[in-house]
Amino acid sequence: MKGGESKAEATSTDQRLKTRGRKAGKKTKKDPNQPKRPPSAFFVFLEDFRKEFNLANPNNKSVATVGKAAGARWKAMTDEDKAPYVAKAESRKTEYIKNVQQYNLKLASGTNREEDDSDKSKSEVDEAVSEEEAEDDD
């Protein structure tokens, strides 16, 4: 073993690392209706820069090259040059905050019918429906 560790010490370290992290496959699913976070000023700049860069370099397929060139230009820009991108990012941020508030109100009011059924498994819902149909036939 490396570093003078015994085999028992190595396995106990592995066990500690396994128990600390989250279990694989237990990710919580994100709501597709949840508003996306707004881009920062740099990413607003990057949207415009990509268009210019792709027109100037149509054969470039490397995302890294575009990112490096954009980063270099962003660092070279003055605060006055960055101001329109910062303003646009701020406006998107305020719009995002409004959207999140509306989204949270919608969740709190419980207008989402899908959430009401999510507590029951599909088989429980199907059984309840079939029992209701059987009662209606009588």
Swiss-Prot record:
Its main location: nucleus. It is found in: Nucleus; Cytoplasm, Cytosol. Induction: Up-regulated by cold stress. The keyword ATP-binding does not apply. GO terms for biological process: chromatin organization. Residues 18-29 have a biased composition (Basic residues). It holds the Pfam family HMG_box. Keywords: Cytoplasm, DNA-binding, Nucleus, Phosphoprotein. Transmembrane segments: none annotated. Residues 126-138 have a biased composition (Acidic residues). Mostly expressed roots and flowers, and, to a lower extent, in stems and leaves. InterPro entries: HMG_box_dom (IPR009071), HMG_box_dom_sf (IPR036910), HMGB_plant (IPR031061). The modification Phosphoserine is found at S123, S130. Residues 35-104 bind DNA. It comes from the Eukaryota. GO terms for cellular component: chromatin; cytoplasm; cytosol; nucleus. Residues 1-41, 105-138 are annotated as: Disordered. One of its GO terms (molecular function) is DNA-binding transcription factor activity. Binds preferentially double-stranded DNA. Belongs to the HMGB family. This is High mobility group B protein 4. It comes from Arabidopsis thaliana (Mouse-ear cress). The lineage of its organism: Eukaryota, Viridiplantae, Streptophyta, Embryophyta, Tracheophyta.
